[in-house]
Structures are given as structure tokens and as C-alpha cells.
Regions:
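Local cysteine-cluster metal-coordination motifs and their immediate loop/turn environment
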Residues: 103, 179-202
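ATP-dependent adenylation/nucleotidyltransferase module used to activate substrates
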Residues: 1-174
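Short Fe-S-cluster ligation motifs
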Residues: 198, 204-211
């Protein structure tokens, strides 16, 4: 039986990946992390989707706000506005976040006897986020083959996809993107000004469709 644990934030990329997993695996589980992020609304979206899809879902409270608070996503810094710019968007890097999350996710996969671990890093993240780059993914994949008696196949299927490509993939699957949350600001509605919102807007425009959250 093919089995997978999907690291699922509640965002557009991991929502598409979760639905891709439903087509490719016999057994699917999901894990979501509350690490003190301002945009906790994404956790609500992840929980609701997993309920609808009847996917076993673990929400992990990391309670690491004091350690991770150097990032604008967690601490008191303002979320930067405007299109993705490397120096500006470095403020949204959460120190070693994906390493921490993937390590915990691997432990859950081992405990639940799942063979594969997926997460939704994509090509648009490479420039800004070190823990989304191919060398990180490849190195961690090697580690997860030797860190336990139960080997985990760690993969990032969207590693070479742009955000536009991911939206296109979701549209081919007829996904409802209103069930995703992208904005980094913790308001009730998307701010439409942060880099994450603007990247999402561009991805839908390049696919000639209206973002359902607009």
C-alpha cells in the first residue's frame, strides 16, 4: 500500500499537493503546525479541508515563539508589503522552520508507518527561503533514509514548479481555491498588499482566472 504524510499549511501550494496525493496514494494523512504565526487563519482552512476530505489530520503546537520571533511572520515586526524582493522578504524567513517541522513530521510518519513525506516547496521560494532550496531537500531526503530503521521517502513534488504552475495544476484538478489561505497578515480578509498576496494574485492572472478570495 502506498502511503504518504503531507505537510499541509492550509495554503494554496500544500492544498494542491494534498489533492495530488489523493490521486497517487492509497493512504493519506496530513500534519499542520502552529508555530505562533500571525496568519493562524491558515490552520482553520487546513482543518476544514481535512474534515471534508476525511483525511486524518494532526495539528502540532510547537510553542517556539520566543525562538522563532526574529521573523516578521511570528514576532512584532510588520509584514513587508509589495512584490517579492529578496532583501525585503528575508524578514519573513522563520529560522530553521522547515527543518524543525519536517523532523517532527518524519517522526509522525514513522510512528504511523507511512512510507513517504511530502511538502510543498516550489521554485518561487528558492531565492528567499534556504530551507526550500533543492540542496536542502536533497540533503534532508538522504538523512531521512538513515535516521531510523523505518526509511522515509522525502519529496517535494513542486520543487521545480512556479506558483503559476501550481495554480494551473490545481485548475486541471478542478480544485476550489477558496478553501486556501495565503495572506501573511492575520486579518479576516487577505490584505492584498503583502508579497504572498501579490504572488498569488499574479499566479491567477497568468492563468487567466479570477482568484476566488478576491
Amino acid at each position: 500500500m502506498k502511503s504518504v504524510l503531507v505537510v499541509y499549511s492550509g495554503g494554496l501550494d500544500s492544498y494542491t499537493l494534498l489533492n495530488k496525493a489523493l490521486k497517487e496514494f492509497d493512504r493519506i494523512e496530513a500534519i499542520t503546525f502552529d508555530y505562533g504565526q500571525k496568519h493562524k487563519k491558515e490552520i482553520q482552512y487546513a482543518t476544514q479541508v481535512c474534515l471534508e476530505l476525511k483525511i486524518e489530520h494532526e495539528v502540532v503546537n510547537l510553542d517556539l515563539e520566543n525562538i522563532l520571533s526574529g521573523s516578521a511572520l511570528v514576532g512584532g515586526k510588520k509584514i513587508p508589503e509589495g512584490n517579492y524582493d529578496k532583501e525585503q522578504m528575508k524578514q519573513t524567513v522563520v529560522p530553521n522552520r522547515n527543518m524543525i517541522m519536517i523532523s517532527i513530521a518524519a517522526s509522525l510518519a514513522i510512528k504511523n508507518n507511512l512510507n513517504t513525506l511530502w511538502y510543498a516547496a516550489h521554485a518561487g521560494d528558492h531565492e528567499i527561503y534556504p530551507d526550500c532550496r533543492p540542496e536542502f531537500i536533497e540533503s534532508l531526503a538522504a538523512v531521512l533514509q538513515i535516521c531510523d530503521y523505518h526509511k522515509i521517502n522525502f519529496q517535494a513534488p513542486f520543487m521545480n514548479y512556479s506558483k503559476t504552475d501550481i495554480v494551473a495544476e490545481g485548475l486541471r484538478m478542478n480544485l476550489d481555491f477558496s478553501k486556501t489561505w495565503t495572506c501573511y497578515v492575520g486579518d479576516e480578509s487577505p490584505c492584498l498588499r503583502c508579497g504572498s498576496c501579490l504572488e498569488r494574485k499574479s499566479a491567477f492572472e497568468l492563468n487567466n482566472v479570477q482568484d476566488p478570495l478576491r
